[in-house]
Amino acid sequence: MKKVQKTLAMLLAAMMLLALAACGGPAPAPTEPPPADTSGDTPPADDGVVVPEEGASLKLWFDNDNYNEKIVELWNAKYPDIPLTVENVGTTDSRTKIELDGPTGMGADVFVQAHDGVAISAQSGNILEIDLFSDEIRSEFVENAINAVSYDGKIYAFPLSMKTIVMFYNKALVDTPVDTWAEMKEFAAEFNDPAQNKFACLWQAVEPYYAHGFLGGYGYDLFGPTHDDPDQLGWDSAEAAEGLAFYKTLQEDVYPVASADATWDAMNTMFSSGAAPYVITGPWSIADFTNAGIDFGIAPLPKMDNGVRPKTLSTVDTVCVSAYTQYPKAAMLLAQFIATDPDCLQLLYETRNELSASIEGQKLDFYANDPFMSSIAVAVNDALPQPYIPEMSNVWAPYQKAVIAVWDGLQTPEEALAAASEEFYSSLVVTE
């Protein structure tokens, strides 16, 4: 019996040695690693550095020739091995152009568009999620701009610049700008001479982008309190009607012209010639007025009869990466470069008079020392970010019809807004 036990013990010991040898034996021969994923979904390296694809070359669409020429020089200085070409394509045209040119391989890798196109482009699959830099965008840009480039909880663009409308005044004609529309009406009663085409204040009066603030200032919430619910258009609200009714008084007492005459050209010509004391426009007019030699200032829009200033819409220009790019990492690096590099932001300021959407960018000396940009920054922070849901594109046409009908005295605010609301919801059914 003892002999059997001894034999079993020896067998068990041998088996244990074999098992240990198997565990501690040489590793299997290495296999070929899988190819690197170069798609836009690839996370950055552990050190946070995004490495562009080998052999990358890029195309950018933007709408300013002076900017386009110099941005290539700045890019080449930092990324000499990634050729960049730039084509002049408008920010209002780039979304539809990428839909056509992207699938053919003729589109840009990176393009700039207004933020109301971001949700549409994301929904239709024409732009990439900026997943490589989403944390950076959420922490380094102003909140309104972050919301403007977000869709379904994801980031789809770099915010570039922020804009809204303000009141410009000619210092040769105005000592101290008015602070209320009641004061403006008193000034207009003395200044206006329609026969001589003299008006106290001019603006693109029947463009909803300009008119909306007066409705917003009376408490109207476009698409509800969070501005993202297409079922809460709100044109049937008392606040919307009250705001539009006040707006009509400006046609009667400040700018008594037909809607067809309240144009950009009229505003720009009269102020640039020194004939108009006040105009309502945005930072895009600074260069024209400066080149015209006008000594002007910028002030907030006057308070309405309820003691509140118009709640204007702010817009954000955004830098998007095409879903059709062959080089998503390089393209995202270009988008980041355009939106955050101090030299690029200075170029944006010098060529377009635009305010950066970057928190640190707004602190750069050339912004901080410019009183016009400081005024724009205050106005932008007080403005309502233009709703960024796809249904926003269905708002403009009926909204303008309502404003024109009231401005020209063809309908009451309630009638005009009811007709506009019906057209809006009918258009959603068609697009679905």
Predicted regions and their residues:
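Conserved N-terminal structural module of periplasmic/extracytoplasmic solute-binding proteins
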Residues: A9, L20-A119, D135, D305-G307, ...
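Hinge/lid segment of periplasmic solute-binding proteins
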Residues: P43-V49, A114-V166, T176-F187, D193-Q196, ...
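Long, aromatic- and glycine/proline-rich binding clefts that accommodate carbohydrate-like moieties
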Residues: P52, A148, A299, Y349-K401, ...
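Extracytoplasmic/periplasmic substrate-binding proteins
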Residues: E73-N76, V118, A245-Y327
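Extracytoplasmic "Venus flytrap"/periplasmic binding protein-like
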Residues: L74-F141, S150, K154-Y156, A172-D179, ...
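A structural signal for short loop-to-beta-strand junctions that line the ligand-binding cleft
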Residues: L100-D101, A108-D109, I137-K171, F199-W203, ...
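Periplasmic solute-binding protein
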Residues: V118-N126, E143-A182, Q204-D229, L313-S322, ...
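Glycine-centered hinge/linker elements that transmit conformational signals in sensory
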Residues: F187-A188, D229-A260
